[in-house]
Each structure stands twice: as structure tokens, then as C-alpha cells.
């Protein structure tokens, strides 16, 4: 259904696209996770990198590659002026990102006020449900002059209901705890989105997420490598090749750090 919609948009207006494939590695990771896949198998003694062997990863890659090859969907870097320009011009009419993207679109696409809405991610028939995309952590660095105060502030910012309300309403951030799903800020209408309660559709999604995804120990570097590869995806450089190249460089970095690979 999603693929048919992408083709219909391109047929109706060759300058427009339903969405784009983002080179952000967290984007692909979220799609793979939703499809039931994984990139790593980690034990106490070894790390297996299985980006190319994973069936769900291949399924997701093949789905998007077909749309890219036929010209229905472009490949872009995320969060760029080019993307927001196309959104303001109504030539890029949706974005498959995390709930925090509601705030970014509202900030960067002023001409889209009243035109945009929020919906759950399209689902695979054999695996209904959603997935996380990205995530964040708050860190106090060693050597901080006010480490104790910084830890107290970070704890308040991440756990106090009033602070979490601010993060939700101003940053579009999703509460990390299940108790946070009762935060009243999630029920607040958003003027940019025609006063829809944009967070509400994701409450049930969050309750039913399967937390079985594992990141590798060198994921920061692996993510950078993957982004450099994904931005090149085209007919001549398919997504499966991007995954293979990322797997190869990831294995090399794991071995260089003395980590046993399977």
C-alpha cells in the first residue's frame, strides 16, 4: 500500500515524492527493527555482525531499493535545508521519522501548518507494530567542575514530571519510562497539526514495542560508516552493498579493538 501510494504521488506530480529514504543510519535501523531484524548477536565473549545475513534487513533493503530504482523515492540526508525546502514547497509530503520529528517539522516547515498530520508507521503484514528510532543519553563527563550538581540536574531533567513535560511540549521528546506515558503533555493539542493530539497515536505503539534490538560496541563508528554508505545508494550502489560495506568496516574496527568476532 505504501509503495503504491509512492508511485501514485510521483505519477500525479513528477516533481513531488511521498517521502524519501534517509541516509541517517537510525532510520534504517528503525525500519529493520520494526521488521523483526537485528544487526548484531552479542554474547559475553563474542560479537557477530549479521547485517548482510539478516533476512529482515534484506527485506527492508529490497523494498526501498525497488522504489529508489524506479524513481518513486529519492535518497537524501536527513534534517537538511534541501529537505525542509521541499516540504515547504509541498513536493515532499511525508517523513518516516520518530515522534520528535513533529517539533522539527513545525520549526522548519512554517508553510506546512495545517497540512501535516501524524500516523503510525506502515506495518509489515507478518509483524505488526512499530519500533524505536534513535534515542539519547545524558552524560556528565569526567573532570567536570560541577559533576555532582550536573548529575542532580540531569536526573531532574530526565525524571521529574514537570521537566519531562517541557521536553515533550518544547522538544517533541518521548518519555523513556512507562509511567511517563501518563504525562498530561502527551494529550496537548498542537496548533501546527490542526490542533491534533499528535502524541496520542504513539501511546499504544510504545506499550507494545518489542525490546529485543542490540547495538554493537562500536556503533558510533559503525553508524558513521553506514551513513557515508547509505547516502550513495542508487541503482549502481544498492542498499545491500551499503550494508555489506558497513559490515566489513565494522568487523575490522571490532578486531582492531581486540574484540572477538564470531
Spell out what each predicted region is.
Residues 69, 205-262:
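Conserved C-terminal helix/tail region of periplasmic/extracytoplasmic solute-binding proteins
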Residues 100-112, 124-228, 261:
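C-terminal lobe and pocket-closing loops
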Residues 3-16, 84-88, 101-109, 251-255:
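Pocket-flanking alpha-helical
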Amino acid at each position: 500500500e505504501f509503495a503504491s501510494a509512492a508511485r501514485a504521488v510521483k505519477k500525479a506530480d513528477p516533481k513531488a515524492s511521498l517521502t524519501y529514504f534517509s541516509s541517517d543510519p537510525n532510520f534504517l535501523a528503525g525500519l529493520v527493527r520494526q521488521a523483526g531484524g537485528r544487526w548484531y548477536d552479542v554474547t559475553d565473549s563474542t560479537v557477530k555482525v549479521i547485517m548482510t545475513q539478516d533476512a529482515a534487513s534484506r527485506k527492508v533493503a529490497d523494498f526501498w531499493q525497488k522504489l529508489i530504482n524506479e524513481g518513486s523515492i529519492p535518497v537524501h540526508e536527513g534534517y537538511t535545508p534541501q529537505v525542509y525546502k521541499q516540504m515547504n514547497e509541498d513536493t515532499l509530503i511525508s517523513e518516516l521519522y520518530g515522534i520528535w520529528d513533529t517539533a522539527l517539522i513545525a520549526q522548519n516547515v512554517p508553510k506546512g501548518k495545517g497540512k501535516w498530520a501524524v500516523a503510525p508507521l506502515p506495518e509489515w503484514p507478518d509483524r505488526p507494530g512499530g519500533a524505536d528510532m534513535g534515542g539519547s543519553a545524558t552524560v556528565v563527563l569526567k573532570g567536570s567542575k560541577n559533576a555532582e550538581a550536573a548529575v542532580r540536574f540531569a536526573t531532574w531533567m530526565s525524571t521529574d514530571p514537570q521537566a519531562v513535560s517541557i521536553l515533550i511540549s518544547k522538544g517533541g521528546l518521548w518519555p523513556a519510562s512507562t509511567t511517563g506515558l501518563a504525562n498530561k503533555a502527551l494529550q496537548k493539542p498542537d496548533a501546527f497539526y490542526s490542533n491534533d493530539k499528535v502524541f496520542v497515536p504513539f501511546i499504544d505503539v510504545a506499550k507494545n514495542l518489542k525490546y529485543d534490538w542490540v547495538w554493537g560496541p562500536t556503533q558510533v563508528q559503525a553508524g558513521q560508516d553506514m551513513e557515508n554508505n547509505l547516502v550513495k545508494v542508487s541503482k549502481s550502489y544498492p542498499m545491500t552493498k551499503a550494508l555489506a560495506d558497513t559490515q566489513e568496516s565494522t568487523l575490522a574496527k571490532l578486531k582492531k579493538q581486540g574484540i572477538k568476532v564470531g
